[in-house]
Amino acid sequence: MKQTLRIAILSAFACAALAAFSNFAQAQKVDFAFGLSTLEAPAANSTGPSLTGGTYPGFSGDVLFWHNFGIGGEIYWRATQSNYASIYGTIPYRPLFLDFDGIYEPKLASHTYLELSAGIGAMDTRQYCSECGNGYNTNYTSDKHFMGDFGAGLKFYPKGGFFIRPEAKVYLVTNNQLFSSSYATRFGASIGYTFGRH
C-alpha cells in the first residue's frame, strides 16, 4: 500500500477514534468494519470510460452519540489498476473514495439495524506512469474531486458485537470529466465489531 493511501486511512480512523474516545462515556456505540465492494456506473461513452467493475476493499468506522444519530467515515479504493484509453495511449488508474457522514441507525428487529448515511468527501483518481509524480518517489498523479454521498445498509448481529452489513452507497462527484458519469453506486458487504450496546 502506498504511503499516501496509508496516511488517508490513518487520518480517517484517527478522526473517528478521536471523536469516539473524547466522548466515549456519552457514546451509545462505536463500530469498526472492513468491507469488499464493486462499483456500478453508466456505460463508457465519448466522455470517458465507465467506473463500473473492480473490487474495492475498504475500512469504515462510526460513533453514535445521541439516540440513533452519529458520525462516521470510510475509505474504499480499487484493489487493482484499470486502464484509461487516452490520446497519449493507455494510462493505468485507480480510484479512491473517502467520505465523512452523518449516520442514523434505528433498530428494526432483534439483532437487526437499518443504517442510513449521507455526507461529503472526495474521489481521488490516481493515474500511474513512470514520468509522473511529485518528486517524492511516487509514480502517479492525483486528480481529486469533491463529492456528496448517501447510502443504506442492513446490519445483522449473528453473535455478540460482531456484525455483517450488506450495503449500497451512491457517490455524486463534481466535475468528474475523466469518466462517463458524475455518479457511481457501490454495492458490497462489510464485517465488523460494535463496542457498546446493540
Task: Show which residues each predicted segment covers.
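Surface-exposed strand-loop-strand hairpins of Gram-negative outer-membrane beta-barrel proteins
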Residues: 37-58, 143-144
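Cleavable N-terminal export/targeting peptides
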Residues: 1-29, 196-198
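Extracellular loop and loop/strand-boundary signature of outer-membrane beta-barrel proteins
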Residues: 44-48, 83-91, 133-140, 174-179
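Transmembrane beta-strand segments of Gram-negative outer membrane beta-barrel proteins
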Residues: 26-42
